[in-house]
Amino acid sequence: MTSTAPSDGTGIIDLDPWLEPFREAIKRRFDYVESWIKTVDEVEGGLDKFSKGYEKFGFNVSETGDITYREWAPNAIEAALVGDFNNWDTKANPMTRDNFGVWEIALPAKNGTPVIPHDSKVKITMVTRSGERIYRIPAWIKRVVQDLNVSPIYESVFWNPPKAERYNFQHARPKKPESLRIYEAHVGISSPDTRVATYKEFTANMLPRIKYLGYNAIQLMAIMEHAYYASFGYQVNNFFAASSRYGKPEDLKELVDTAHSMGLVVLLDVVHSHASKNVDDGLNMFDGSDHLYFHSGSKGQHELWDSRLFNYGNHEVLRFLLSNLRFWMEEYGFDGFRFDGVTSMLYTHHGIGTGFSGGYHEYFGPAVDDDGVMYLALANEMLHRLYPDCITVAEDVSGMPALCLPHGLGGVGFDYRLAMAIPDMYIKLLKEKSDNDWDIGNLAFTLTNRRHGEKTIAYAESHDQALVGDKSLMMWLCDKEMYTHMSVLTEFTPVIERGMALHKMIRLVTHALGGEGYLNFEGNEFGHPEWLDFPRAGNNNSFWYARRQLNLTEDHLLRYRFLNEFDRAMQLTESKYGWLHAPQAYISLKHEGDKVLVFERADLLWIFNFHPTESFTDYRVGVEQAGTYRVVLDTDDQAFGGLGRIDQGTRFFTTDMEWNGRRNYLQVYIPTRTALALALEETL
């Protein structure tokens, strides 16, 4: 942001003059965020203090062992703290209320020891205005546990381990990567066994695998506590509790710290777009009213997700959500967030039954939820002020302009957005088109169709495509032959040959052309067979598909290891040449007849031959920089399960003659269904 940029939030218009007709709407949006920042400054002493709500609310223990517990519940007319410590006596520990509906109780220590034992059950009980006595899990609780032998309903526990049992972080956060290469993972499925895997197993088994593959970021799903395992973590009950299914809070801290020791940043998949509608172990109807943290009536219900919608324009809701982000950064050492369901937060229609044409009126009209936009801008402003290296990623299908520009320019402040159109394109191609009918121009357009100056994370597939009812790319490509012909002892059938070739090419073209970051969902890097289906009534609570068969890459008689090694080579080559943080590619050729795509990015020359049957000898390719080129990545390499049709030692010499708008050309042999990345010899 330059010093000459306007300070009224209209700087984005200088970057994109097509936004000029919406100047007033942009300025109004900016002013609304500024008014909230001013309110927080005046009333709360600034975003720093405001986002530390967990130091005031919930349970806090002093150095001397005194406990203070506070809860916002304005609809309650009585409140008391109950638990194992007082035999659930509703009269033993009454709470007092202030003028803002905040209930409080102080419990002095006995002989320097907290009166509530560590890991013992607690709840708040309230009497509502209708006279009903209710029991609730504290909203800011840091640990809840579930015993399915007793009930599916979670129980809240007072978590205050002795100092000797607390995890002490040993390693500093790594610097924010210039090129973000994300490995998306779910702790519970990270094992070939038919059970829930643990934080400790992830630390021991998955972190070395992710590091070996060359990723520099991990995105952890389903960490915020959720009662329904099959929700994939997207129906959150307890926002400050790390899921107890996988182990203790200390185990998650060890996971993050160990990742940091390996140079890996860790992002939390944060769900602030909605909340579980559970009453007994969630936030819903917390104080007996339907409008405490959420909008009342139908406005507070998400009809597709069957969940509750936050009221982002409420002061205490903002405190709760901003403090939640801060808590995960401070308590667990996360390095940033992937915000789930951002489209639902940005619009009052929540994206339901609404397509986006890309017309700017859709982003600045009456359908925009001003409070949702304000909260996201405030969240990004707080995070980036306090943690300059914090990484935020938005999951938005609408394509809202300025989502990934700073608030000062009039943006919402995210670092990256997910390129959600890319995986949809691949599924459409594989479902509906024969290989001869692939539209190379449309492929290139979809991969490069992103807003200038706003960073995008490209991916060929994520967890969405792995879920039951959908198929991973490898399943679309190979189908039932995955079960019979992925052994090197069986015939290399045309189906498997095509599947492996396109699996590598699709990933490489996405990585090289599609964005400023790259994401892969665990297992998909090696073509994991089958889909994901969590234990539920519809499958007899089976874990058979709720696991990742990561052992498949360790069997040298299976072809999965070739895809795994290719993925590693792709990440390591990016690490060396840095195309993800280089300017967008220059595309010099999109040949529909030959099915050839050629482009340059980060001083590498990329050549893709998607033709299903034709190989080309001495194919002339334009290139800007003169010199001698060598192969740095070849999808047909035998090390990656290819046919090895290209001599890796070949030197390609440029000719000083313009070709396809480039100053020079060179000639290459490009076999069918093969992609090459060439680099100048002196960079090897």
Curated annotation (Swiss-Prot):
EC annotation from Swiss-Prot or TrEMBL: 2.4.1.18
Residues of the active site = 340 (nucleophile), 395 (proton donor)
Subcellular location per UniProt equals: Cytoplasm
An annotated GO cellular component: cytoplasm
Q: Which GO BP annotation is one of this protein's?
A: glycogen biosynthetic process
Q: In which pathway does it act?
A: Glycan biosynthesis; glycogen biosynthesis
Q: Which UniProt keywords apply?
A: Cytoplasm, Glycogen biosynthesis, Glycosyltransferase, Transferase
- Transferase among keywords: yes
Q: Which Pfam families match?
A: Alpha-amylase, Alpha-amylase_C, CBM_48
SMART domains per the UniProt record, alphabetical: Aamy
Chain positions of site Transition state stabilizer: 464
Q: Which reaction does it catalyse?
A: Transfers a segment of a (1->4)-alpha-D-glucan chain to a primary hydroxy group in a similar glucan chain
Q: Which residues bind (1,4-alpha-D-glucosyl)n?
A: 88, 123
Q: Name one GO molecular function term.
A: 1,4-alpha-glucan branching enzyme activity
Q: What is its main location?
A: cytoplasm
> What EC class does the entry list?
transferase
Q: Which family does it belong to?
A: Belongs to the glycosyl hydrolase 13 family. GlgB subfamily.
Function description: Glycogen-branching enzyme participates in the glycogen biosynthetic process along with glycogenin and glycogen synthase. Generates alpha-1,6-glucosidic branches from alpha-1,4-linked glucose chains, to increase solubility of the glycogen polymer.
In Swiss-Prot or TrEMBL terms, this protein is called 1,4-alpha-glucan-branching enzyme
Q: Which organism is it from?
A: Emericella nidulans (strain FGSC A4 / ATCC 38163 / CBS 112.46 / NRRL 194 / M139)
